[in-house]
Amino acid sequence: MPLKPFAPSEPYTLGVELELQVVSPPGFNLSQDSSTLISALESRVTAGEVKHDITESMLEIATGVCRDINQVAAEFAAMQREILACAQQYHLMISGGGTHPFQKWQRQEVCSSERYARTLELFGYLIKQATVFGQHVHVGCRNGEEAMYLLHGLSRFVPHFVALSASSPYMQGADTGFASSRLNIFSAFPDNGPAPFAADWTQFEKMYARLEGTKVVESIKDLHWDIRPSPGFGTVEVRVMDTPLTLERAINIAGFIQAISHWLLDERPYKHKAEDYLIYRFNRFQACRYGLEGTLTDVSTGEQRTIGEDILRLLDKLERYARPLNASSALEAIHRYVKNNDSDVHRIREFTADGGSLSELVRLNGEIWAA
């Protein structure tokens, strides 16, 4: 399918997607009942969307186009009420978190759709292993040139987004030692990591045409880069975050991304080049492994500081850009998370360090999501 023309969007508008865990008490393993929930919810969700993701244990919720995080919060709150009521009716529980701590990929059922069937045929067991749960944030852009500048600008802050959302230390019943183990799942996929460098929208269109011409991909949706343009929506989509344990944290991360986007497109502080990505994967690894305590290396100067320290430095630049977007409260929350070392991954590990079992952890995460 040829690349769609870039559809102009109101700048800095938001669309937020969250992939949620559908859990079956009393054992608190993943359920295979998302289709049942979605069928029951379709007529009850009036703003935003509830839909399938890869496997039957995943439930995706998505806002419509939102002006600010207040509208995002309102849409998600309304969806959450309906989802929790419906889940209770079917004796299910909903949870956040980037991974389920002890599910086995072998028992996952891929959703019934032509697209997922093709994906399963191509990638085999990797698709079932990708039963992990992420947050995606779309940011509106006026044109493709803005989108390419924003894509490269936001790529500098991928470690920040990973560290702030990290909530997947456990996988397959074991502590992985990572703050976010979710992203490691995608390392075997050929489109893992950053998008190939394109200096402008015209160059991106040519690059995509070559990919599509070789039949490697059929649409932009087949490219699961960390950040990608979505020309049909007129957005840039950030895809690296774990689903946090709470809606509040997810919304604040979206506001943080929105404020950074405003700053980037207003000030144009960087002259992007391919060499900017030289240590991208090293910085991303540090965020996945150590979260906010990970080491961030400046590709230009070689200067190093923790990701948490760099977030605090960045917040000082963003306030004047957050204010007109009604995102100041998000920056205040991000500041609090970093200063207090308040992260989902610490909360999870503290619970198990105190003797909590992994099934009890899932129960607790479900209660946190519903609170």
Curated annotation (Swiss-Prot):
Domain of life: Bacteria
Catalytic class of the enzyme: ligase
Keywords: ATP-binding, Ligase, Nucleotide-binding
Substrates-to-products reaction catalysed: L-cysteine + L-glutamate + ATP = gamma-L-glutamyl-L-cysteine + ADP + phosphate + H(+)
Gene3D superfamilies listed in its UniProt record: 3.30.590.20
GO molecular function, one term: glutamate-cysteine ligase activity
Keyword Ligase: yes
Enzyme Commission designation: 6.3.2.2
Coiled coil: none
Xref: Pfam families: GCS2
Gene Ontology process terms (BP): modified amino acid biosynthetic process
PANTHER family documented for this protein: GLUTAMATE--CYSTEINE LIGASE 2-RELATED
Family: Belongs to the glutamate--cysteine ligase type 2 family. YbdK subfamily.
Function summary: ATP-dependent carboxylate-amine ligase which exhibits weak glutamate--cysteine ligase activity.
Subunit architecture: Homodimer.
The protein's name: Putative glutamate--cysteine ligase 2
